[in-house]
Structure formats: C-alpha cells, structure tokens
Design a protein with these regions (language model features):
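Solvent-exposed loop/turn segments connecting transmembrane beta-strands
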Residues: 128-132, 143-144, 148-166, 277-281, ...
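Residues that define the transmembrane beta-barrel architecture of outer-membrane proteins
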Residues: 56-58, 130-135, 163-169, 185, ...
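Outer-membrane beta-barrel biogenesis signature
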Residues: 14-110, 184
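Transmembrane beta-strands of outer-membrane beta-barrel pores
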Residues: 66-70, 153-157, 175, 193-199, ...
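Residues on the lipid-exposed face of transmembrane beta-strands in outer-membrane beta-barrel proteins
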Residues: 44, 51, 62-64, 137-143, ...
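Outer membrane beta-barrel transmembrane domains
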Residues: 83-85, 92-96, 102, 245-318
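Extracellular/periplasm-exposed beta-strand and loop segments of Gram-negative cell-envelope proteins
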Residues: 75-77, 109, 113-129, 158-164, ...
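Short loop/turn motifs that connect adjacent beta-strands in outer-membrane beta-barrel proteins
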Residues: 50-58, 73, 161, 176-189, ...
C-alpha cells in the first residue's frame, strides 16, 4: 500500500512538473513569435488599393509590390524574469533581455529540474532584422458597379531559414459614383475589405530536454499561421498625373502557433499553443502618392500602426 502511494505521488509530481514546463515553454514561444504575427498583419494589409477611383469595368491592372516593415527596438527584445516562470530559471541572473524572432543572437541559458533531473538549454536566437522586405505580385480586375477585385499569391519561399507563403483577395467599391456630377478627378471615396492568409516558419538551433533517459521535448521550428481581415475607408484626389490618397482601417487577425520537433510533451505544447493565438484587432492609417505615366502607375504608401510599413508598387493597366 505504501509503495503504491509512493508510485502514485511520483507519477502525479512528474505530471505536475511537465505541465509547468509546458506553461514555461508557452511563454517563451509567445514572447518569441508574437512580433512576427503582428508584423505579418501590417504587411498583409498594405498595398491592396492605392486609389479610390474606379478602375473601369473589365479593365485589368497587373502590379508588383515591395513591402518594407521597420522593426522598432521594443519588438526585437523582450524582458524575461525568473518570476515569470514555474520551473525554469535564467542561468546566472534573475532577468534577461531575450530576442524575439526579429532580435539577434543571445548567450542566455535556461536551466531547470524535471523529475529530479537537472537540464539546461540555450534561449532561441532571432533573425537580427531591423527591416523585413516582402515582395509580391497582384492582379486587379474592374467589375461592374464601380467594384474591383484584387488577388495576390506568393508560393512558399525560404530566406535566411524563414519560410513565407501568402495569398489573399480584396474588394473595393467606389462611392463617389453616387455623388451628383462627380468626375474622375474629383475627390473620390471608396470602401475596402480584404482577406489574407499567411504562413511563416522559422528553423532554429534545436532545444532538447530529457528526463529519466527519455526525450521529453525537442523543439527546432516555430510555425505561425495567420488569417487577417482588413476593413478600410479610402479617399483620393487626382491632380493631373499626380494623385494623393489616404486611408483609415482596422485589421482583425487570428493567429495559430505551433512548434516543430519531437518528444512526449510536443503534442500537449502544440495543443496549448493553438489556444494561445486568439484574435487581435489593430487600427492603422495609410498615406500615399501615385504618379501616372501612360498606362503605368508608380505608387508609394506609408502605413502607421503597431509597426511602420512602406510599400512601393509598379502598376500596368490593360
């Protein structure tokens, strides 16, 4: 009976330690990956439409864009303290600045004890990025009733151990057509709604935690999947070959995190990460300029939100 109680206590204690370890790894993953999800929301909502004017029924515009999102210092590091963790500690210190996915290398080491056995692992290194460039093509088609549909798609590409794929669809409807005596060079007003899907994965130096001779957790990759909606009001004014436009909008983003690797705790960790993402709502403002040369248009737009993003586009109207 006594031996049975000891075995039960030992099993319960091991389960408790593993649950606490999962909570600690959730915090590390959240701090590391959240800035990437936020930056993805800003980039995916940029460059959809650069004019409130009607493109024209069944007219087609082919464009190539480049986004550059600027990463502030506050999004490159995250302060961590021993009091934030359950069984993990920062080796040799009570707190440390840890890199996010955009931060640089770090010499911070975590240590802890699981089922009576000590373990340690290096904190995850970041990409050391202050600017993230994202090019993409887009096709826009004019529909009846002053409406346009835009499509963009980028297959998965890997740059510096980061894989990215994006796709999306956007709709714009011109409301100036309902104004009496409205002309194309008058003040234009439109509403925009878009949907984007983004997949990001980042491979890093593996983290391994073992106890009682078995691998408890191995992590070597973080995956971020995002579904992002944009609702935006767009205004523009044409002055000859030059056009000014501005927009105010809101993004609603659903993020899904998961970790790649192995070990007995990985399924539990990913289940908890799946519940961690949730919905994030952000406001954003755009200001931009267009220059028309025949059937070509050069657009530039600047977005202010949780990040600052610049978009440059070259458009050709058929």
């Amino acid at each position: 009976m006594f031996i049975s109680l000891l075995l039960t206590f030992g099993f319960t204690n091991a389960q408790s330690d593993q649950d606490l370890l999962v909570e600690d790894m959730l915090l590390i993953a959240d701090n590391f990956g959240t800035p990437a999800a936020e930056a993805a929301a800003i980039q995916s909502s940029a460059g959809w439409f650069s004019s409130a004017r009607d493109l024209g029924e069944w007219k087609v515009e082919i464009s190539v864009h480049g986004n550059a999102v600027f990463i502030p210092g506050s999004k490159q590091t995250k302060l961590a303290s021993n009091k934030d963790f359950n069984i993990l500690n920062i080796q040799g210190s009570t707190n440390a600045l840890l890199p996010t996915v955009f931060g640089g290398d770090t010499d911070v080491v975590f240590e802890g004890e699981l089922i009576g056995q000590e373990f340690s692992f290096d904190a995850i290194d970041g990409l050391n990025k202050e600017v993230v460039i994202h090019p993409f093509p887009q096709v826009t088609v004019g529909l009846p009733y002053g409406t346009e549909v835009a499509l963009r798609f980028v297959p998965r590409v890997t740059i510096n151990d980061v894989g990215v794929s994006t796709s999306g669809i956007g709709l714009k409807h011109n409301f100036a057509q309902y104004f009496k005596y409205s002309r194309p060079d008058d003040f234009q007003v439109a509403a925009v709604v878009t949907y984007s899907n983004i997949n990001i994965d980042y491979e890093y130096t593996p983290i391994e935690i073992s106890a009682s001779g078995s691998k408890v957790l191995e992590l070597n990759r973080i995956d971020v999947k995002a579904d992002i909606w944009l609702l935006q009001g767009l205004v523009s004014k044409l002055y000859g070959d030059f056009e000014v436009f501005g927009a105010m909008g809101v993004t609603s983003s659903n993020f899904d995190y998961s970790m790649g690797g192995g070990g007995s705790l990985l399924p539990t960790l990913n289940d908890e990460l799946g519940a961690l993402g949730g919905n994030d709502v952000k406001f954003k403002a755009d200001l931009g300029f267009n220059y028309y040369i025949g059937n070509f248009k050069i657009s530039s737009a600047f977005t202010a939100g949780s990040f600052f993003n610049a978009n440059l586009g070259l458009h050709y109207k058929i």
